[in-house]
Amino acid sequence: MVDSFVQSKLRDNKVTLFVKGSCPYCKNAIVLLKEFNFLPGCLEVVDITGMDDIQDYFQKTTGQRTVPRVFIGTKCIGGFSDLQKMEQQLPMMLRQIGALV
């Protein structure tokens, strides 16, 4: 059930952030990504507050339990610090998956 929930949120041409509302790193990731001009439906923020089973799933599948979990297309690129490190590459990556206007 957790696997199908997570997989239902991922698409090749979309960026998906799994976040918790009280997490400052999650808020920073959202701010960073909202600087880009995404096509409608190509940026989704999924609040998993209170869903520890999803974090357990991420531990098994990505090696990390922390949030945010950032997916570009169907690939997990990590958390906020990983997103920051890739900031210069993001425009090209987002264009490659067809997520930008």
UniProtKB/Swiss-Prot annotation:
GO molecular-function term, one example from the UniProt record: glutathione disulfide oxidoreductase activity
Main location: cytoplasm
Source species, domain of life: Eukaryota
Pfam families in UniProt: Glutaredoxin
Positions of the Glutaredoxin domain: 3-101
Entry's Gene Ontology cellular component terms: cytoplasm
Keywords in alphabetical order: Cytoplasm, Disulfide bond, Electron transport, Redox-active center, Transport
Subcellular compartments: Cytoplasm
Gene3D superfamilies reported in the protein's UniProt record: Glutaredoxin
Cysteine disulfide links: C23-C26
Entry keyword Lipid metabolism: no
InterPro entries: GLR_AS, GLRX1, Glutaredoxin, Glutaredoxin_subgr, Thioredoxin-like_sf
Entry keyword Cytoplasm: yes
Function of the protein: Has a glutathione-disulfide oxidoreductase activity in the presence of NADPH and glutathione reductase. Reduces low molecular weight disulfides and proteins.
Similarity comment: Belongs to the glutaredoxin family.
Protein name according to UniProt: Glutaredoxin-1
Organism: Gallus gallus (Chicken)
